[in-house]
């Protein structure tokens, strides 16, 4: 068998052999591996990183051996294919040093037959195919998904020097593999034939010898070489030999019959191609070159830069009929095949988007024809025959006379089947050309007249012939034979070789790009490419020249550059070009081109003019000015721009570059000046991230899987999803990373000082903010050299956008001043809001949250914005500002300017041009706090400007119940007041129609030593809004709309003598004591000390608050701590102790043997009636039976309350108009001579009793759900009829509640016949400290019997100060109730607890100067809620274990006289009317949004330490509170 031995240095020998014998794989030639040590073959590197595949055919009898190997040259990644385990193929590979993944086929391949082997790489997966019968895949568990390949593709073995260099091999064990023995052929990578680079000890052979074994494909009769002749490939199907003759040029069962339709290299084989025994055993391709080959065919391969040029100048063409024939084979869609002529006399034949294009112009206009196949395209790598004929024909015209006219009939056919016929226009029938005949391309294809393409042909052309009546030009033959008139440009192979395809690439991310060499296109140039995407925006091509400074003296710092760009914006394709004398921007096509289809773009220029075409639609352009030179000095960027853009200059007209819009989609067939660019190879060489060497469109929409987290908005992109995170507070591709928050207190800022001055015509800005102020700067661009700005600010609760483009310093038509847009309303609600700004030239769009966008158009021709800085919080660059916006107080997040998230970039240190003092993280903001240390302190500021509208904001913190916060008077009766009244905020004003009062809404008094936020506003429609923390109250007033203020604005109070002259609705009698902060007066942030016209009293910066705060142990013996601004005080009322901290003994009397008594009598006109009572006393005794304290009503009423000892246990009995009610502590023995404290409370029929620290005993009356409504309705009934109604209610089984007309308090029990003997201390009853009064010889007290005062009376300073403080804050409303001493408690199993009481008043009903003087009429003047809760147990609750049984009151009563019955009936009618009015009252309405409360007062309260009751009590309290500030009259 004839062989060609390939030794070391085999690259030259192998290539020489292939040139002599033809393409080795076209006719089935293979490589024979003898299995010798040192054998190997190296093919070009297979870039198997991502998605790719290779295939080959294998034939062997060996059971072991290395078939294929490549790696990353000693690091981590490799792929190995070996024969093992009885001739089966085993594949192993690894990525990123992961555990290698291995698969083993089930089918042995060492049967001496040919097998097709295919390896497909897909990131972490690799699949191995054997013939059509087996496919297996395996996945490697790697953190990285792309494989790195550095080495060549080694087949059959490894070079000895590589085996010896251990560090060069990633898989060390591959050195020990046996070499492969057998044959391998048809090695292909991604369907393209791969040729060996070099080899050692490997033979080239076209047909492997028979190996014996009886295979159907092995030799037939003796003397024959096998079943399949002429290089046919044999395979076994159903135990029968089947020949594949597709690559031989023969056909038939055994590939013995000549095929007349020969393709590929087969056309070279003419004459007798049979095999002879006298051929010295030369096999493979060589035998095909023997014998009579008949007519020789002339073929040439063009790779994009080669072409033929035949000079016609000596023998010009002049013809009316002619014919052009040629055959072509290619994989490329576009390319020039033939051209002759110039100006308006030419013929052009080209491949355009896979179809054959013919353009003929004989001087009267172009005739164009396009021939397309029915299915697919002509660029299918198969041979196609083209024939163009032009004949002169005579036709008859119709008109005034019959005239014979000549026309040229043009016919073009492809493969003899697809034909198109047309006519050139009349009068011009002759084709004349004295120029050149171009074949396969030209020096500048884009500049050829009529050329529909700009790139040269890539592929094979065969038998290119032009002929007419006078001449026959066999252009292919003339080129090969070296005719002197034929010039060959480039290295042309006169055979058909495979031309590497210009594979498409995909830019998967906006950040991915490819750098191309500098484009030298000073005078002329062309670029063509195809693209495909569904994304609306992206920079496709960009390059610029050397920067040069603007010659305009008005703007010396403006840098100009020549540039060229093609970009997509909003789905439209734009060409941008500037040659130094002005920019041209052309929309290439009116329709959008982001529909996912392929579009062919062809750009051509010649000096100032040129065209850009999309598919077949061409748009001409002419650049302004005189310059015709395009001077590009930088690289040409494809798909985007590098991340480090320091050296780049972006013209303002290239919007996508400044907006950071990279292209995402596919690009293919890039030709520059007619030369192809293998962008796939460039991407591999540059190791560009995010560039994939293929193009496919996923059918599934990525957004269907909801990939955007945290409510991000999803948009489908090109094989990806795009999340809009601007309104979420998160960042990242999927909105998965929480964005950084910046906190501003009015003195803080963040300033981005850009490295170079920026000039833009398009901006994308988004941010989130949260503020309680109606004014404040959010973001602004500022310039050191001009008034240019793009500014976002809060203005009266709305977002205001201001865009000012300064026309003074440049040559432009003067604009009409800043453009402004407003959006949103009431945005100072302490909620997060999202702002988006989009500017495109003159067009503006402003959006807040999800509201409708506000749009506007800028006046003038100037659209360029200049800025050096991006500022937030405070504007520091103020040189060109006519008015400075108010500083910002609040929070900012997710500030993004043209794709740059500056807050997070600044925090992470990704940029070094960031200056800030704003604080990272969400913080409670207390700006510029000031302390008013006394109630006489105040400041005066300039008059409040609030004529048409008003927005006030401040924060305060105090322990005072009352105080004037703000006051400003004006013309006439106009004024405004903000004050605290009993811990609640009042807003009082008069616009000229009379004073109005709006009470702020809050769940509890605001004097809790915590910060509270107050916003007060009035809009132009007289809508008044008061917001306290999260509670909102609104009111609309009629009449006058303007607040005309004139005098100074007082903060914190006024002069002492001024309080007397304040308007009637103003309660304040003294100033505010506490802290104020963040004061905002209609957008003005005053410094309360520096800006004050004058100050009075003690005012200091900062807010330290009380130096001493209430703690759990501030007061002893269960005393209640009361927080004061200058300290604390203790309420010792219910402790029996006294002193500043309730740790001193209370006033004590000893009752000796024989008994004694202390009696207190109320004056006849001052006898209280109460719904609630509180009693506390300390004692020590050894008696088993005694009465300690008894309170009786006036004679004849029978109401009483008695504290007594029975059988050594303490108990209370009381009667408020029904049967006696008793409550007793049965578990505590108190007659042990030790000191005990007993506390008793009553509210209606409810009662509690506690001894020392024992659990509280609770007593609940029988009743129903009407109790609360009846209690409210009873207020409407005159007192004189109250007893009648109570009697009627008693009949109905309802509990009475009022302890009427209390007359005496008797201490000692002597009158009751059970005199007390022992010690009594610190008696407290409903605000009266009777033992103290006795010791001070009060006139209403009488002492009889053996009673002796122990020691001295406790200091009146402490006791009286506490009592005075208590009394001064008391309210005498009938609705106020006593707070229980402790939460409801299970009688057993719970340890004793100390539960201090809250600061509330006893429910004492007294006559008032503001009420009717009748002492029996106790109709309240101003009902209001008090305390925390009544101790009424929640409905449906089971009795506590061990507690006293709930006693139902008897419904029996004494008989009623007729008059009383009549009065009761009248009262029933009144009651029903009152209930009807109550249920249908108009309470007004306002909106309260508590869904989000971001500013939380996290500090623990240092006010009074009060433990509230469990839900049963809290619920009752809430029901009472909702009736506060309501007045009812009957």
UniProtKB/Swiss-Prot annotation:
Post-translational modification: O-glycosylated; contains heparan sulfate. Heparan sulfate attachment is required for synapse development by mediating interactions with neuroligins and LRRTM2.
Stretches for region Disordered: 199-221, 1411-1443, 1497-1530
Laminin G-like domain span: 31-212, 299-496, 503-695, 741-914, 928-1103, 1149-1347
SMART domains: 4.1m, EGF, LamG
Disulfide bridge partners, by residue number: 228-243, 245-255, 460-496, 666-695, 703-714, 708-723, 725-735, 906-914, 1075-1103, 1110-1121, 1115-1130, 1132-1142
Cytoplasmic side: 1476-1530
Transmembrane segments: 1455-1475
Region described as Interaction with CASK: spans on this chain: 1497-1523
Signal sequence coordinates: 1-30
Binding-site residues for Ca(2+) 1, renumbered to this chain: 345, 362, 430
GO molecular-function term, one example from the UniProt record: metal ion binding
UniProt keyword 4Fe-4S, yes or no: no
Keywords: Calcium, Cell adhesion, Cell membrane, Cell projection, Disulfide bond, EGF-like domain, Glycoprotein, Heparan sulfate, Membrane, Metal-binding, Proteoglycan, Repeat, Signal, Synapse, Transmembrane, Transmembrane helix
GO terms of biological process kind: cell adhesion
Subunit structure: Interacts (via laminin G-like domain 2 and/or laminin G-like domain 6) with NLGN1 forming a heterotetramer, where one NLGN1 dimer interacts with one NRXN1 dimer. Also interacts (via laminin G-like domain 2 and/or laminin G-like domain 6) with NLGN2, NLGN3 and NLGN4L; interactions with NLGN1, NLGN2, NLGN3 and NLGN4L are calcium-dependent. Interacts (via cytoplasmic C-terminal region) with CASK (via the PDZ, SH3 and guanylate kinase-like domains). Interacts (via cytoplasmic C-terminus) with CASKIN1 and APBA1. Interacts (via laminin G-like domain 2) with NXPH1 and NXPH3.
PANTHER family linked to this entry: PIKACHURIN-LIKE PROTEIN, SP2353, ISOFORM A
Family: Belongs to the neurexin family.
Functional note: Cell surface protein involved in cell-cell-interactions, exocytosis of secretory granules and regulation of signal transmission. Function is isoform-specific. Alpha-type isoforms have a long N-terminus with six laminin G-like domains and play an important role in synaptic signal transmission. Alpha-type isoforms play a role in the regulation of calcium channel activity and Ca(2+)-triggered neurotransmitter release at synapses and at neuromuscular junctions. They play an important role in Ca(2+)-triggered exocytosis of secretory granules in pituitary gland.
Protein name: Neurexin-1
Classification lineage: Eukaryota, Metazoa, Chordata, Craniata, Vertebrata
